[in-house]
């Protein structure tokens, strides 16, 4: 029974990976690029990006995102495991927003050269509406960090914070994310301070977000605006 059980578990995991993976770009062996691209540290590597709608891209195609465009520029294998509405700490399966990331990371592929986690927006919203503090988020974020380090000991791992959303619990959530990641020596791109994404301004959102009332999801122009910041950050890892 043991071999059968192992095979059954492997099959379930494979099906779960297929169900959760939003897009898989493979390396193009005939890719043409200038030498400065081909010689870059990102070129031809495998990128796994994991998170919420900042990764799945809400109602727009994944191909419009900064991370997909980055992968295409450097001919990377690209594996997208975004899930709209997903949280680091809170299970939202009943709402069709998926299990919490501190558990869901286990379905990620075994190999990656770069692992990017974009998360925290929905946790902050939940804490804002329920009035609870950050202790539970902190505890489960630690589980996620430890799990990813163990799963990907040779990968370049980093987190990206949400934007500087002007609502309660977003600053508190971001402070915890920065603190916890620092305690594990995980690099973080602090998008609340360094992104150039002015989420508090309606005119800015009308140009660069998927709708003027949206405070999370960039449109294609917004992703193009943010891409150079993340490109510089990732090339420096």
Segments from the language model and where they lie:
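Solvent-exposed, polar/charged alpha-helical surfaces in well-ordered, non-transmembrane soluble domains
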Residues: 64, 68, 72, 139-146, ...
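Conserved SGNH/GDSL esterase-like catalytic core that processes O-acyl groups on lipids
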Residues: 46-48, 54-134, 139, 168
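Active-site segments of SGNH/GDSL-like serine hydrolases
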Residues: 121-122, 145-179
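Conserved beta-strand segments of alpha/beta enzyme cores
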Residues: 77-79, 156, 185-187
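N-terminal-biased segments
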Residues: 20-34, 121-144
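Catalytic His-Asp segment of secreted/periplasmic serine-dependent ester chemistry enzymes
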Residues: 94, 164-237
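N-terminal secretory targeting modules
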Residues: 1-50, 54-62, 71-73, 108-111, ...
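Conserved beta-strand termini and adjacent loop/short-helix elements that scaffold enzyme active sites
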Residues: 81-83, 160, 191-194
